[in-house]
């Protein structure tokens, strides 16, 4: 690849351009320089300087109003906060989207125009708040769980490696999880300071308590 490496600029944020230009519109709704955080995986907790710079980039964008112009840009913010493991902030933008950008039938609208990417992006963000698997060989459960969701359950969430996750949690703590391997394979499951090494045959499952 001939793409230049990700750089941190003078503001402590990720550079949007090859040169560290002064931003003309610091609150713009497009945030393609954060692609490495979401939906890709070049920026994770394993790259702490970039992880911190990504968070600062988002904070700066939001300070100048970048997020609320469209449903899809709001959905992008939800996913960013999920990847940063900031559940309260993610939930705040879910609520903002529901209050200001959805029609009564839950379609994401820009004026009278239906923009389905807002709906797809927001639901993807909710899933990311509950299960993440973008890091090689790791599945994280409840990585960005907000206080308002402190008790609940989900079934059938998919993870990389062709795993399927069903789980219950109570008072903010994992109660039970079942990991089903559709194809067979290994992975590590991480949740709230605990780790499990999983090695399953095709069609087999393992319950974590």
Residue ranges: model-predicted function:
Residues 1-134, 138:
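Active-site core of glycosidic bond-cleaving carbohydrate-active enzymes
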Residues 88-209:
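Non-catalytic C-terminal accessory modules of carbohydrate-active enzymes
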């Amino acid at each position: 690849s001939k793409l230049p490496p990700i750089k941190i600029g003078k503001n402590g944020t990720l550079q949007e351009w090859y040169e560290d230009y002064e931003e003309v519109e610091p609150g713009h709704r497009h945030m393609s320089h954060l692609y490495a955080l979401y939906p890709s995986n070049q920026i994770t907790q394993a790259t702490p300087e970039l992880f911190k710079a990504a968070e600062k980039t988002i904070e700066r964008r939001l300070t100048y109003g970048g997020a609320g112009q469209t449903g899809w840009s709001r959905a992008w913010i939800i996913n960013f906060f999920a990847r940063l493991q900031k559940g309260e902030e993610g939930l705040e933008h879910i609520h903002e989207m529901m209050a200001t950008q959805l029609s009564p039938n839950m379609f994401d609208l820009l004026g009278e125009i239906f923009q389905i990417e807002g709906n797809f992006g927001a639901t993807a963000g909710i899933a990311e708040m509950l299960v993440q698997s973008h890091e090689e060989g790791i599945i994280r459960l409840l990585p960005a769980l907000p206080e308002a969701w402190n008790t609940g359950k989900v079934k059938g969430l998919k993870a990389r490696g062709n795993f399927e996750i069903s789980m219950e949690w109570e008072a903010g703590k994992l109660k039970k999880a079942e990991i089903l391997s559709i194809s067979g394979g290994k992975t590590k499951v991480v949740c709230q300071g605990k780790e499990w090494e999983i090695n399953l045959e095709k069609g087999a499952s393992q319950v974590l308590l």
